[in-house]
């Protein structure tokens, strides 16, 4: 890790600690420091959404900020944990948005969601259904919560295997193995759900 990256990690950790201790300005400083990275995560998640989605990456980051305001009392450890939680919150925002749209339509047919079984990242089709993925992840959580965390960190937050291993306190080898199993399980679930 370069000195600049290390310094930024230290800055992020310090801001997270200040924020959790009640410093209201720390969240603003944190978002200023991490806005571009949060927006990149949001853009990655929005690429998986249907064309014409009413949210855009900027709106998603702004919604994230509003939800983070309520998370001040969480125990924040480091930059990687922050991005894991931010990615999970963005996913929840998209799920809530999709559910609200579906309720407004009074129904709607689910869309086929495909995951690239051979790819490193289980990329939901750009026209994928965030609700189908969320439902599948909830079923997986009942079986193996660790695999859900790995999917959240790798797929939604875009963390590397090494970063994911660090956040979870596991070896990269274990994370790779669990990542493969989780992708295969999710792929199978989404295939069954679409048939």
Which role does the model predict for each range below?
Residues 1-195:
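Intrinsic, short, N-terminal disordered tails of RNA polymerase sigma-factor systems
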């Amino acid at each position: 890790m370069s000195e600049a990256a290390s310094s930024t990690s230290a800055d992020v950790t310090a801001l997270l600690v200040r924020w959790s201790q009640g410093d209201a300005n720390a969240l603003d400083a944190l978002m200023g420091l991490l806005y571009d990275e949060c927006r990149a995560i949001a853009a990655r998640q929005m690429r998986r959404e249907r064309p014409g989605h009413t949210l855009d990456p900027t709106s998603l980051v702004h919604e994230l900020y509003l939800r983070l305001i309520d998370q001040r009392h969480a125990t924040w450890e480091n930059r990687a944990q922050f991005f894991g939680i931010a990615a999970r919150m963005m996913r929840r925002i998209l799920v809530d948005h999709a559910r609200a749209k579906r309720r407004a339509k009074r129904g709607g047919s689910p869309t086929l969601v495909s995951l690239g079984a051979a790819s490193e990242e289980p990329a939901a089709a750009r026209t994928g259904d965030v609700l189908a993925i969320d439902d599948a992840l909830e079923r997986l959580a009942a079986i193996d919560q660790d695999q859900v965390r790995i999917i959240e960190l790798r797929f939604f937050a875009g963390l590397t295997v090494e970063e994911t291993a660090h956040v979870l306190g596991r070896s990269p080898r274990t994370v790779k193995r669990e990542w493969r199993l989780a992708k295969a399980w999710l792929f199978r679930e989404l295939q069954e759900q679409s048939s």
